[in-house]
Amino acid sequence: MKILITTDWYTPAVNGVVTSVKNLQRELERRGHEVRILTLSQSLHSWSRDGVTAIGSVNAGRIYPGARLRTAMAGRWVRELMDWRSDVIHSQCEFSTFFLARRIAEELDVPLVHTYHTVYEDYTHYFSPSVRWGRCAVAAFSRWVAAQVDGMIAPTGKVRGLLQGYGVRCPVFVVPTGIDLRRFQQEGDPMRRAVLRASLGIPAENTVLVCVGRLAE
């Protein structure tokens, strides 16, 4: 299949969406699919190379740290992607590139699938002093996004439950975000581990469990 992935976030940015997109791209290509990426440039300059098309944008960090908004006209770049004729469009973000994804899907008459990465309820303090009003706005926005697509992917059952609670009517499928286990299966240096244990006061015979989580404001 030819699969076009659209995302406001891509390298060199580092966050969960970028990690998810890169993992998805790698695994789809490993299985023999052709994948192209439509994203935002880190400058006003649009470009296309190595299967990635980036549309000129400006910094929108006042809305959310690291965010960008499309400013450049995308006609030429969209036409090139239409000529490629993807079989399905997989959107990863709800803003700048989502509108391009919808436009391309409509022109090509192909399915548009969207992954709902962000629980916006947790970030309403960025735009609303009222938690209740913020949740209502998120629910309405999520319903609008769902009405534009043929199906949504939720990374967890919790997120699917939230979407259903918002009144989303399109099909919602739970597909957990994958992890590249190869990064964690490398043998460490025994001497380095011993030095680290000693520096932390952990006896050699003790089992160590490490929990990796996140802190969000």
Regions found by a protein language model. Name each.
Residues 1-45, 49-56:
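N-terminal subdomain of nucleotide-sugar transferases
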Residues 6, 155, 211-213:
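Short hydrophobic "strand-cap" motifs at the C-terminus of beta-strands
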Residues 39, 53-56, 135, 139-191, ...:
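Donor nucleotide-sugar binding/catalytic pocket of nucleotide-sugar-dependent glycosyltransferases
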Residues 49-79, 91:
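A short, charged, and often flexible helix/loop element on the N-terminal side
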Residues 81, 85-89:
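Proline-aspartate-enriched helix->loop->beta-strand connector
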Residues 89-122:
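An aromatic- and histidine-rich active-site surface loop
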Residues 113-140, 182-187:
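Acceptor-binding helix/loop patch of EC 2.4 sugar-transfer enzymes
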Residues 191, 203-217:
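Conserved donor-binding/catalytic core segment of Leloir-type glycosyltransferases
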